[in-house]
Amino acid sequence: MGMSSLKLLKYVLFFFNFLFWVCGCCILGFGIHLLVQNTYGILFRNLPFLTLGNVLVIVGSIIMVVAFLGCMGSIKENKCLLMSFFVLLLLILLAEVTLAILLFVYEKKINTLVAEGLNDSIQHYHSDNSTRMAWDFIQSQLQCCGVNGSSDWISGPPSSCPSGADVQGCYKKGQAWFHSNFLYIGIVTICVCVIQVLGMSFALTLNCQIDKTSQALGL
């Protein structure tokens, strides 16, 4: 691999990381917007930090940091930054695999906790504005009512509940949505993992090539 190949690899790695950095900025900005507007509220009162805004801010920040290291490491041909980029990608990949395994192993327990969390939050619909906004959004988007049905609303279903006797509860409707989109979720997850592995491979290759070039130039 000559100098021309080194430059090509360097700019390819920089370009893709720059795109990811821009995506991270957009995700972070949207997350901050949701936090400021408090649009979707809190659905699980026992996990108040688990809101769409918080999740997007965390994900966007991580993407920006990792992509920044990749950009600077590639364009500056800095081995320390490249290895930091590689290690962070590896840790993220391991975390994703660990999370997938835990979700599979504890699927029933997680389902139980989700149902309990939903049943608890529905009791605070009229007393907590964030909880009310979250439930109104979920019910209007999924066209569902309550956790298991409209009977969950003791004082009567709110206006966000769709009318009709055969309306499903949001718990089953959410499960149905997840299962119907499982293939697409799996494809996106695999694509993300492949991109991460490619990024790690490019970083290692560029790092090794920098060593070879330095040795050839007697540096």
Curated annotation (Swiss-Prot):
Compartment(s): Cell membrane; Cell junction; Membrane
Membrane topology term: Multi-pass membrane protein
PROSITE patterns (UniProt xref): TM4_1
Residues with glycosylation annotation: N119, N129, N148
Cytoplasmic side: 2-11, 70-80, 207-219
GO cellular component: cell surface; cell-cell junction; immunological synapse; plasma membrane
Disulphide connectivity of cysteines: none
Membrane-traversing stretches: 12-32, 55-69, 81-106, 182-206
Function description: Required for efficient formation of myofibers in regenerating muscle at the level of cell fusion. May be involved in growth regulation in hematopoietic cells.
Subunit structure: Interacts with SCIMP. Interacts with CD45/PTPRC. Interacts with IL7R. Interacts with RBL2 and PPP2CA.
Family, as annotated: Belongs to the tetraspanin (TM4SF) family.
Descriptive protein name: Leukocyte surface antigen CD53
Organism: Rattus norvegicus (Rat)
